[in-house]
């Protein structure tokens, strides 16, 4: 269950993986695009997971229709704003939304820096309207190669004040972290916090690489860490958090069942691991499902679920003062 005395967070939530089906339909019609269906009910199977996908890359293809309709910077601004609205309606007090500006710009050749500006603007408007604390994580989409990632990094750093952290996502097997060392050196020099998708499609060596070569402070998914006892020891000792996404890991065939998911093992090993969604609109789930359905099915006790909820705030890329302010806001002590 969700503890109402603790801030509810989602620190692994893709903005460009959370574009509403209705918005895809609206924007598709606005820009005269040939969508796979012209009614909401018939469009959903094309933009939402309806069965377990065979691998991560197949899962990621479900995201493509969402960004295919981003025909203008105003469209990017709209989906950013709606992401904040969705987070607030899900009951979140704090979220870190991550996005790939290159991926969002690609289909309609939008200016990448313009996409970053539009997303920052949409998030700021949403935070004002819905009274929620949202931070942005810029993604380098490794699937598109080193040069595209340099363009993304340049655009993100041009708006450093609106970006909290940098992530590496996409085809983990085809584009290992070692290709992006110089990108992350620049990001760290600019003061960005670092999280990296690792140990989702590739093995523990990908997580070691993210830590040693890219400077990862947190690991996205990190499922394969369970295969390396020394790695789990290291994660626990150095408080390198794991952003767990339970339902997502089933849908991508990263784990075969919730019962075999390693989140409970991580928590019992002393690793700071949290519960998150990943791509809510594509997955057809929200954060409540992960706490009320997925976490118990993954073998977490009520105490462990509460610990994972507390870990979400502990892992957040904000100051200790900001964390305490959130605690006081949610459960004021008179």
From Swiss-Prot:
Mind telling me what this protein is named?
Answer: Adenosine deaminase
Keyword Hydrolase applies = yes
Report the GO terms under cellular component.
Answer: cytosol
As for family, the record states: Belongs to the metallo-dependent hydrolases superfamily. Adenosine and AMP deaminases family. Adenosine deaminase subfamily.
Disulfide bonding pattern of the chain: none
The cofactor required is: Zn(2+)
What residues form the catalytic site here?
200
A Pfam family: A_deaminase
Record-listed E.C. numbers: 3.5.4.4
Question: Which spans are transmembrane here?
Answer: none
Which InterPro entries does UniProt cross-reference here? A/AMP_deam_AS, A_deaminase, A_deaminase_dom, Ado/ade_deaminase, Metal_Hydrolase
Q: Where is this site: Important for catalytic activity?
A: 221
Any GO MF annotation of the entry: adenosine deaminase activity
Q: Which UniProt keywords apply?
A: Hydrolase, Metal-binding, Nucleotide metabolism, Zinc
Q: Which reaction does it catalyse?
A: adenosine + H2O + H(+) = inosine + NH4(+); 2'-deoxyadenosine + H2O + H(+) = 2'-deoxyinosine + NH4(+)
Q: Name one GO biological process term.
A: inosine biosynthetic process
Gene3D superfamilies (UniProt xref): Metal-dependent hydrolases
Q: How is the cofactor bound?
A: Binds 1 zinc ion per subunit.
Organism lineage = Bacteria, Pseudomonadati, Pseudomonadota, Gammaproteobacteria, Enterobacterales
Q: Where does Zn(2+) bind?
A: 12, 14, 197, 278
Q: What does this protein do?
A: Catalyzes the hydrolytic deamination of adenosine and 2-deoxyadenosine.
Binding positions (substrate) = 14, 16, 170, 279
């Amino acid at each position: 269950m969700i503890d109402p005395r603790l801030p509810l967070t989602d620190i692994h939530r893709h903005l460009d993986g959370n574009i509403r089906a209705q918005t895809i339909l609206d924007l598709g019609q606005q820009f005269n695009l040939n969508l796979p269906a012209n009614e909401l009910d018939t469009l959903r199977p094309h933009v939402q997971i309806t069965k377990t996908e065979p691998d991560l890359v197949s899962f990621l293809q479900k995201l493509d229709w969402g960004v295919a309709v981003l025909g203008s910077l105003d469209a990017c601004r709209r989906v950013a704003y709606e992401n904040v609205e969705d987070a607030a309606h899900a009951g979140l007090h704090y979220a870190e939304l991550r996005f790939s500006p290159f991926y969002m710009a690609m289909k309609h050749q939008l200016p990448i820096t313009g996409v970053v500006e539009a997303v920052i603007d949409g998030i700021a408007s949403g935070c004002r309207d819905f009274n929620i604390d949202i931070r942005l994580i810029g993604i380098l989409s490794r699937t598109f190669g080193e040069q595209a990632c340099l363009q993304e990094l340049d655009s993100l750093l041009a708006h450093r004040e609106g970006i909290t952290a940098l992530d590496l996502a996409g085809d983990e097997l085809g584009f290992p972290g070692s290709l992006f060392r110089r990108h992350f050196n620049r990001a760290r020099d600019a003061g960005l916090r670092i999280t990296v998708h690792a140990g989702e499609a590739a093995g523990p060596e990908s997580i070691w690489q993210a830590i040693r070569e890219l400077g990862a402070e947190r690991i996205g998914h990190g499922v394969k860490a369970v295969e390396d006892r020394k790695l789990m020891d290291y994660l626990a000792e150095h408080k390198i958090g794991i952003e767990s996404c339970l339902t997502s890991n089933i849908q991508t065939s990263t784990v075969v069942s919730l019962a075999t998911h390693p989140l409970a093992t991580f928590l019992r090993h002393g690793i700071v691991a949290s519960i998150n969604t990943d791509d809510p609109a594509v997955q057809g789930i929200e954060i409540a499902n992960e706490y009320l359905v997925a976490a118990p099915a993954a073998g977490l006790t009520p105490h462990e679920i509460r610990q994972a909820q507390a870990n979400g705030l502990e892992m957040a890329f904000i100051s200790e003062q900001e964390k305490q302010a959130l605690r006081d806001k949610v459960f004021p002590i008179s």
